[in-house]
């Protein structure tokens, strides 16, 4: 069963078409990376999924039921924008308030569980206003986990975090899918981090889905290349273009060769031409470069 099944979804705000005939499929249990530039329609789509906005047209099914179904709506955890917390209250008291809003009876055990899941069990007595950005985001996720949701919708939860905060967030999201058995829809502009956790991707542009794929399909679509440095970038690029089909130069002078060729053969060829290679290695393009090329920003 799919967690989310969207067909022909559109949303207009006056004359602005925010979402345009969008089709989208999120399998149950996936960590679905939702990708697009600012204004592409990501947040609008997420808000329609959560019932915070009404579609102009189209359908949204969650676990085979209409997204307005009361039972389904009660099983969606949401973190869109900043978590709504009282700054002078402790983390624990904010969690208790949220549990009361959700009419959770005897919530202490569940609150302790979700705080442990998001690595915040040692900060329960801290005032919310004294928490770091990363801690606040994890508190927001803990609130979204109250009530044991089947679907978790997170809008840009890792933006602005430092390296350690991102690492913790990766661990938290992985634990959530394993221990709560819920599906995670997550949007982010930090594609390098998203690539480390996502099992599926959807890329949206101008309100339309332009590509959906699994992590395995992304891996297959991202070519391996040989990278090298010689200190004579542009000159060597011209030399190599005479022998190989796809040769590119990065801003720092690194040359990339995308042909199916061995690095030792490249070194030998350049040696014959009187060029000494200072560094050479094999690498693979990732999600960020894949996205840039898909958007038409391919380097020449």
What are these regions (language model features)?
Residues 1-10, 297-300:
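ABC-family P-loop ATPase nucleotide-binding domain
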Residues 4, 11-186, 191-205, 209-211:
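ABC transporter nucleotide-binding domains
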Residues 66-67, 231-233, 260-261, 285:
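Short, surface-exposed acidic/glycine-rich loop or hinge patches that mediate macromolecular interfaces
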Residues 72, 236-239, 266, 270:
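Hydrophobic side chains in well-ordered alpha-helices
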Residues 103, 119, 243-244, 274:
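Glycine-centered loop/turn motif at secondary-structure junctions
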Residues 170-258:
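ABC transporter nucleotide-binding domain
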């Amino acid at each position: 069963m799919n967690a989310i099944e969207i067909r022909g979804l559109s949303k207009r705000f006056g004359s602005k078409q925010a979402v345009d005939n969008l089709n989208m499929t999120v399998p149950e249990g996936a960590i679905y990376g939702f990708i697009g530039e600012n204004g592409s329609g990501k947040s609008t789509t997420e808000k329609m999924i959560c019932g915070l906005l009404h579609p102009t047209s189209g359908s949204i099914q969650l676990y085979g039921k209409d997204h307005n179904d009361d039972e389904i709506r009660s099983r969606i955890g949401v973190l869109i924008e900043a978590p709504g917390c009282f700054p002078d209250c402790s983390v624990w008291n904010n969690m208790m308030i949220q549990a009361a809003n959700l009419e959770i009876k005897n919530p202490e055990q569940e609150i302790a569980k979700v705080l442990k899941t998001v690595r915040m069990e040692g900060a329960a007595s801290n005032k919310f206003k004294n928490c770091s950005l990363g801690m606040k985001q994890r508190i927001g996720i803990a609130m979204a986990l109250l009530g044991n949701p089947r679907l978790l919708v997170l809008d840009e939860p890792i933006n602005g975090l430092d390296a350690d905060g991102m690492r913790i967030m990766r661990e938290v999201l992985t634990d959530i899918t394993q221990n709560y058995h819920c599906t995670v829809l997550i949007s982010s502009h930090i594609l390098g981090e998203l690539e480390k956790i996502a099992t599926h991707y959807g890329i949206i542009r101008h309100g339309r889905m332009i590509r959906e794929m699994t992590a395995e399909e992304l891996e297959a679509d991202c070519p391996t290349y040989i990278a090298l440095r010689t200190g004579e970038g542009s000159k060597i690029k011209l030399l190599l273009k005479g022998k190989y089909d796809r040769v590119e130069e990065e801003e720092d002078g690194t040359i990339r060769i995308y042909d199916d060729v061995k690095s030792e053969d490249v070194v030998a060829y350049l040696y014959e031409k009187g060029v000494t290679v200072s560094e050479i290695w094999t690498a693979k393009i990732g999600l960020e470069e894949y996205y840039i090329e898909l958007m038409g920003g391919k380097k020449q």
